[in-house]
Amino acid sequence: MKPSIVAKLEALQERHEEVLAHLGDADVIADQERFRALSREYAQLTDVTNCFKAWSAVQDDLKAAEIMLDDPEMREMAQEEIRDAKVRNEELEQQLQLLLLPKDPDDERNCFLEVRAGTGGDEAAIFAGDLFRMYSRYAESRRWKVEVISANDGEHGGYKEIIAKVSGEQVYGHLKFESGGHRVQRVPETESQGRIHTSACTVAVLPEIPDAELPEISPSDLRIDTFRSSGAGGQHVNTTDSAIRITHIPTGIVVECQDERSQHKNKAKAMSVLAARIRAAEVRKRQEAEASERRNLLGSGDRSDRNRTYNFPQGRVTDHRINLTLYRLDEVIEGKLDMLVQPIVNEYQADLLSALSEQD
């Protein structure tokens, strides 16, 4: 392992011990906010510290075994210990490299999931409904909560657009690579000739922004319109102007929310989505400015990217970003997404590891 990486690990181990000492300090214990922050840092450092201690112990074992090689009676046992230690050393180095990868602070957060019908008319809207159902099933399997913020129903089923908040553990970290273009190839129910049609949807996944990190939005930059809700809602539908449309004038970003009967609640939800979109636009702009020649798997989250093709006649789903094809579309569309999500995460980590290995 490179000396620079060892030095970095030694510094993290020292910090781990330092944080532990702080956690036993009476002043820190009395300051609950600082205590919680240090507790989180301690938890984050524990895995890498324990792994580094195990790696250091293996180095000691290797040195001891190499000394034993000089003793003819111990040589055979020493050679066996060296073989075992080298295998263990390689395993621990791989673990340490993964633990050293830069963490995306947004990975722990809830997210807003947006699915929009693209080209393909009614069939695209139906596919948008299928995608949202797929993500909802996936969320259910992970015990996440899905809360619809806004939905614009398609004329023959599905959605022209649907926005939902997904809450739970590591939500954004699992869903962020879903941002982009999704294409479906299948025979529509209304197709009498049996011809395969191609339709498309776009998916955007935005991390929820904590109140403390909300971008400053001047009221003068907003245009707020109210209108009457449409869709399900019983006797209260169309009786009050409870739906909200907020336009952020500088960026042209528009958010609607009509899910709640309370105008105040709709406005609060719409502002949360607006803040997430503004921040995402800022991040995208910064990523584009800092873009290097190195391939970036996630890209900027550009919705024109073609992520996947779902081919129903062949039961095939293809992720074009990593050239992965699975003939398990029936399982994927029912929400078993880990078989697609994990390979992308692995590829992304491999890119980061490659960059880490190029550092001094």
Swiss-Prot record:
Any Pfam family hit: RF-1
Chain positions with N5-methylglutamine modification: 235
Protein name according to UniProt: Peptide chain release factor 1
Family note: Belongs to the prokaryotic/mitochondrial release factor family.
Species, as recorded: Photorhabdus laumondii subsp. laumondii (strain DSM 15139 / CIP 105565 / TT01)
Functional note: Peptide chain release factor 1 directs the termination of translation in response to the peptide chain termination codons UAG and UAA.
GO molecular function, one term: translation release factor activity, codon specific
Record's compositionally biased regions (Basic and acidic residues): 285-308
Keyword Cytoplasm: yes
Domain of life the protein comes from: Bacteria
Gene3D superfamilies linked to this entry: 3.30.160.20, 3.30.70.1660, 6.10.140.1950
